Regions:
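Bacterial N-terminal signal peptides
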Residues: 1-7
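Glycan-recognition and catalytic cores of secretory/periplasmic carbohydrate-active enzymes
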Residues: 10-174
């Protein structure tokens, strides 16, 4: 409350100019011996491979593979995880893409491209993608609903998933 009163009484506070400027993170150089250098190296060598491995073992990729070939024969009760689990793949792609911009790694780049192939194949013809629905559009996961976006205010997580997919795309193509 007090800061609002002060800023209303002191209009110059709102007009001050910051003496710092943002720079693209790719222009910031860190030695591998620094705290952040160690952290990014650990992310590249341990965290990101583990996260991709978990996506594989927890069925995240298989949901995308099934979504690439939707079928009324798919029993959505056997869907791997929850309607928001597509984001595990997207967030891992995003983090890995940021790491690649500071510490290039051709093996990691190729792996990301292979995951992106799986994701792209799962998109519907108009670009829509939510594996919990796309796997079997006639009988989607109960959280998703029979029509796109119809349960967004409940549990479908369609916008949540879309937002994380866009974040991953931006990071990858920067």
């Amino acid at each position: 409350g007090l800061s609002v009163v002060c800023s209303a009484q002191c209009p110059l506070v709102a007009q001050t100019k910051s003496s710092t400027e943002a720079v693209p993170f790719t222009q910031v150089k860190m030695s591998e011996a620094s705290f952040w250098g160690h952290s990014i190296k650990a992310a590249r060598e341990v965290t990101i491979p583990l996260a991709f491995s978990k996506c594989e073992t927890m069925g995240r990729y298989s949901n995308f593979v099934k979504a690439a070939h939707p079928s009324p024969d798919y029993d959505v009760s056997k869907f791997m995880g929850f309607s928001f689990d597509d984001t595990d793949v997207y967030k891992t792609i995003e983090g890995a893409s940021y790491v690649l911009q500071t510490m290039p790694d051709k093996h990691l780049e190729a792996y990301i491209d292979s995951v992106l192939d799986i994701v792209a194949a799962a998109q519907e013809s108009d670009g829509y993608l939510n594996t919990a629905r796309t796997i079997n559009p006639a009988k989607p996961h109960g959280w998703v609903g029979s029509k796109r976006w119809s349960k967004e205010e409940e549990l479908s997580h369609e916008l949540y998933n879309l937002g994380h997919m866009v974040d991953a795309a931006c990071a990858h193509y920067q």
